[in-house]
Each structure stands twice: as C-alpha cells, then as structure tokens.
C-alpha cells in the first residue's frame, strides 16, 4: 500500500511538472515613445513576437494582414501605445488587447501596460468568432491574462516597478497551464 502511494505521488509530481510553463519578458525594441517587450518561453529560441512573424513568411496568404499589423506597430512606435490603437480582448483592467483594431484575418495579442510599455505575446489566424473558442488563440491569450495578473501582483508588492518606458525587477514567470 505504501509503495502504491509513492508511485501515485511520483506520477502526480511528473504530471504537475509537465504542466508548468517557465517564461520571461524581454525588451525587444526601444522607440522614442514606447518600449516593445515580448514573452519568451523558456524552451523556445525565439520570442513570441518573433514566432508570430515566423508563421507568416513573405508571400503567404496573409501578406496584407501582416502589412496591416506592421503598419500599426510602426504607428505605435512613433506615437506610443495609445488606448485607441487596441482591440480589448481580456477582462476589464488586465490590458490584454489585440492588433489590429480593424477587421483582419490575423490577431497579434499583447498587454498594453501603459502608453509607454507594450508586451507582445503570440497570435495567429482568427479561426473562430472569439478567442475563447479557438484552440490555438486561447492559449496565447490565457498566457497574457496570467502574465498581466503576475505583473499586477508584483507591482503591488513592490518586486516590480515601472520607470518611464522600463519594467524593472524580476521578469521571470512560472505558469501552470490549464489543460
């Protein structure tokens, strides 16, 4: 009986470990008006923003949509991450948004932390009416919702703070995936 409990406990431990996602937030571009950060999953070589663009190489069926997103990123880089540039996708107050604001086949998800700080996640083809119904998009948005919650908590307890366009403090996170 004791042996069985150990096996079950070990199996539960392995299961829990396999459902844990480690990642960080890294600065990827500095502009006069805003800094762009991106989620970087621990096991991946590229940031989530880079992985998004890798999915849609030049000459793909979504060139026009990618051009629209790039135009928005250029505009945000020049003017800042103003609220009117984003389509809100998360819960009230979490800052989770999508680019572009106009109708498009693609969504790039991000956290608008302020007019001066934007944190990118990943995104993809809008294959359902809402991100909650999409297997691929829901994973990206849920990661950002959790990240927003982690950042808010750290800002509140003083282990993370914002100075102008910089996020200062521990930008490493561990997330239990909800599968």
Model-derived segments and spans:
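Acidic/polar active-site rim loop that often engages polyanionic ligands
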Residues: 121-126
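Basic, Lys/Arg-enriched alpha-helical interface segments
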Residues: 2-105, 127-179
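Active-site beta-strand-loop-beta-strand hairpin of nuclease catalytic cores
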Residues: 111-120
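Short, surface-exposed charged micro-motifs
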Residues: 107-109
